[in-house]
Design a protein with these regions (language model features):
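Conserved beta-propeller blade repeats
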Residues: 1-4, 21-44, 69-88, 115-132
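Beta-propeller blade-edge and WD-like acidic-aromatic loop motif
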Residues: 4-22, 39-41, 46-66, 84, ...
Length: 156
């Protein structure tokens, strides 16, 4: 499993053995996901100047690489094959849910979340990548919303 403790990213087996730190870039580590093949971790990094990035680091002592810079994401998640990311911007002026294509590093806004706490909007894909779900309290109470992507992405 993977974890963030005292600002550092680490991995260990389920019984806690083999615990070790993983190489990361400088900044605050946010959400972390295993890459679908289990060989690397994808994580959200916020730099000291407020910029955010999705980065990838190999679990077995490899290099840390930039996947894409983002529009100040508060949260993100990959689709089933790791080719597209759903992101939630942390801006009150532009509270967007966006898709980020890994291959082109281009973003596409799909809707506004208007959540009072953007990090809790937590956009995630359906297993086939044809819907994005997110949470928002824009109507005064927490609710889960779904956006159908209408074939924008290939099924996974």
């Amino acid at each position: 499993f993977c974890y963030v403790r005292d600002g550092s990213l680490g991995v260990a087996s389920l019984d806690g053995r083999g615990e070790r730190a993983v190489i990361t870039a400088e900044g605050r580590i946010g959400q972390v996901f295993w890459r679908p093949d289990g060989e690397a971790l994808l994580y959200l990094l916020t730099r000291g100047d407020g910029r955010s990035e999705i980065r990838e680091t190999a679990v077995k002592g490899g290099a840390d690489t930039l996947v894409a810079t983002t529009t100040r994401y508060a949260a993100f998640s990959p689709n089933a094959d790791g080719s597209v990311f759903a992101g939630v911007t942390g801006s009150a002026a532009q509270p967007h849910v966006v898709l980020l294509l890994r291959s082109t590093r281009k973003e596409l806004t799909i809707c506004e979340h208007r959540a009072s706490r953007p990090g809790e909007a937590a956009a995630v894909f359906s297993p086939d990548s044809q819907r994005v779900y997110f949470q928002s309290d824009a109507a005064g109470r927490p609710a889960i919303f779904s956006v159908r992507l209408n074939g924008v992405l290939e099924q996974t």
